[in-house]
């Protein structure tokens, strides 16, 4: 079984599109900036995308939708 599950992630965000956008942006930040460490204490994943998903499920990442 994958961690975190898609169900637990969808409880935190409003759509799969938002999930992909937020996690990809955070993963890019983790990969490009060595001084930025993970926001979770000890991530289970070694890959930046997995770490970003763990941060989302543990409420370390927030997003704000801009109205147009």
UniProtKB/Swiss-Prot annotation:
It holds the Pfam family RNA_pol_Rpb6. The keyword Transferase applies. Disulfide bonds: none annotated. It comes from the Bacteria. GO terms for cellular component: DNA-directed RNA polymerase complex. Keywords: DNA-directed RNA polymerase, Nucleotidyltransferase, Transcription, Transferase. Transmembrane segments: none annotated. Its EC number is 2.7.7.6. GO terms for biological process: DNA-templated transcription. GO terms for molecular function: DNA binding; DNA-directed RNA polymerase activity. It is an enzyme of class 2 (transferase). It catalyses: RNA(n) + a ribonucleoside 5'-triphosphate = RNA(n+1) + diphosphate. Promotes RNA polymerase assembly. Latches the N- and C-terminal regions of the beta' subunit thereby facilitating its interaction with the beta and alpha subunits. The RNAP catalytic core consists of 2 alpha, 1 beta, 1 beta' and 1 omega subunit. When a sigma factor is associated with the core the holoenzyme is formed, which can initiate transcription. Belongs to the RNA polymerase subunit omega family. NCBIfam families: rpoZ. This is DNA-directed RNA polymerase subunit omega. It comes from Halalkalibacterium halodurans (strain ATCC BAA-125 / DSM 18197 / FERM 7344 / JCM 9153 / C-125).
């Amino acid at each position: 079984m994958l961690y975190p599950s898609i169900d637990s992630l969808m409880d935190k965000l409003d759509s799969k599109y938002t999930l992909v956008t937020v996690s990809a942006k955070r993963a890019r930040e983790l990969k490009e900036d060595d001084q930025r460490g993970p926001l979770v204490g000890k991530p289970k994943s070694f890959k930046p995308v997995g770490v970003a998903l763990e941060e989302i499920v543990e409420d370390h990442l927030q997003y704000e939708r801009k109205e147009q």
